[in-house]
Amino acid sequence: MGPVSVLPSPQSLSTWEGDLAKMTHLQAGLSPDTIEKARLELNENPDILHQDIQQVRDMIITRPDIGFLRTDDAFILRFLRARKFHQADAFRLLAQYFQYRQLNLDMFKNFKADDPGIKRALIDGFPGVLENRDHYGRKILLLFAANWDQSRNSFTDILRAILLSLEVLIEDPELQINGFILIIDWSNFSFKQASKLTPSILKLAIEGLQDSFPARFGGVHFVNQPWYIHALYTLIKPFLKDKTRKRIFLHGNNLNSLHQLIHPEFLPSEFGGTLPPYDMGTWARTLLGPDYSDENDYTHTSYNAMHVKHTCSNLERECSPKPMKRSQSVVEAGTLKHEEKGENENTQPLLALD
C-alpha cells in the first residue's frame, strides 16, 4: 500500500477556501462549530448576511415614533440571530428594544455599572455570572433570590443590573448564537420577599427580557422553590407568550433533573456541581474592574467587551483578597438532596424567555 497523504485534496482545499471567502467580517472570531450552528439553527447565511441586515434597517422608516439610536450592522445582526433571521420578527424586536427604553426612561438614566443602584445590586450578586460556559456554549447566569435585601436594593435596580450585564455579554457574537441559561435558587426566599413581586414589576421584567432584548435563553431553571413561587404563575401567565412557557423548569430539590439539562461539571457546589461555591462578588469585580475610576462609563454603547476578558484574566493578580459572599442555600453546599422525580413532581415549564 502506498503512502497515505495527510494533505487536503485540491478539491477539498478549494471548497474550504470558498467557505472561508463567504465569511464576512461580522463572523470573524466565531469558531467553525459556532458558524455551522448559526447556519443550521438560526438560518444564518454569509452570502446574504448584509442583505438581511439592510432589509431590517429599511424597515426603520415605518416607525417614526421610535428613536433608533443605533443601527450599525453588528447591532442589527444580534436581533436577526435572536429571531432566527426572520427579518420582520427581528425588526419588531429591535423596535421593542428602543421603545422599552423610551417608555422606561428612569431605568436607563445613568445606565452604567457605577450607578449607585446598579452597583449595589452587582455587589450583592445580581446577577451571578459563571466564568465557563456549559456544554452547548451557553453562558450561565445565577440569581440567589434570598440575597435580595429590599431595604438595600429595589427590584428595578436588580433588573437594571441584569439588563446591563446582558448588554455587556451580548457583545460576544458567540453568545448571540449559543445564548444563555438562568438558574434561580429560591432557598430561604421568604413569603414577605415574594409579596413584593407585584404584577407590575413582574410585567416590567418580562417585557424587558422576553419582548425587548436580543438574547437567546435556552432555559430558566427554578431550584428549591417554595409553594408561593408556584403561585406566582397565576400572576405572570397573562404576560407570557405560548412559546415562552416551555423554557422554565421547576426542579425543587431534585438536582437529577437539573443535571440532565446542565452537566454538574459546569455548576458550582450550591447546585450539586463539581465547581467551588460561587463567589457573589465575581461579576461585580469584573464589571467595575480593579482599576475602576469615575472616568469609566460602562454603558451598553461605550463598554469595551474586551475589558471583561482582560479583567477576568487579571482578577487574581490585581484584586485584593475579599471575603467570599455565599448564597443562602437551605442546605450546605455539596450536600443538596438528590431525589428521584415522583409522579406528582412539578417539573412543568413555568416561564421562558425567547
Swiss-Prot record:
It is found in: Golgi apparatus, trans-Golgi network membrane; Early endosome membrane; Cytoplasmic vesicle, Clathrin-coated vesicle. It comes from the Eukaryota. Its main location: Golgi. Residues 345-354 have a biased composition (Polar residues). One of its GO terms (biological process) is lysosome organization. Keywords: Cytoplasmic vesicle, Endosome, Golgi apparatus, Lipid-binding, Membrane. The keyword Membrane applies. GO terms for cellular component: clathrin-coated vesicle; early endosome membrane; endosome; trans-Golgi network. SMART domains: CRAL_TRIO_N (SM01100), SEC14 (SM00516). Residues 335-344 have a biased composition (Basic and acidic residues). Residues 118-279 form the CRAL-TRIO domain. It is a peripheral membrane protein. GO terms for molecular function: phosphatidylinositol-3,5-bisphosphate binding. Gene3D superfamilies: Alpha-tocopherol transfer, CRAL-TRIO lipid binding domain, N-terminal domain of phosphatidylinositol transfer protein sec14p. Residues 317-354 are annotated as: Disordered. Required for normal morphology of late endosomes and/or lysosomes in neurons. Binds phosphatidylinositol 3,5-bisphosphate (PtdIns(3,5)P2). The CRAL-TRIO domain is required for targeting to the membrane and for binding PtdIns(3,5)P2. Binding to PtdIns(3,5)P2 is not required for localization. Forms a complex with clathrin heavy chain and gamma-adaptin. This is Clavesin-1. It comes from Mus musculus. The gene is Clvs1.
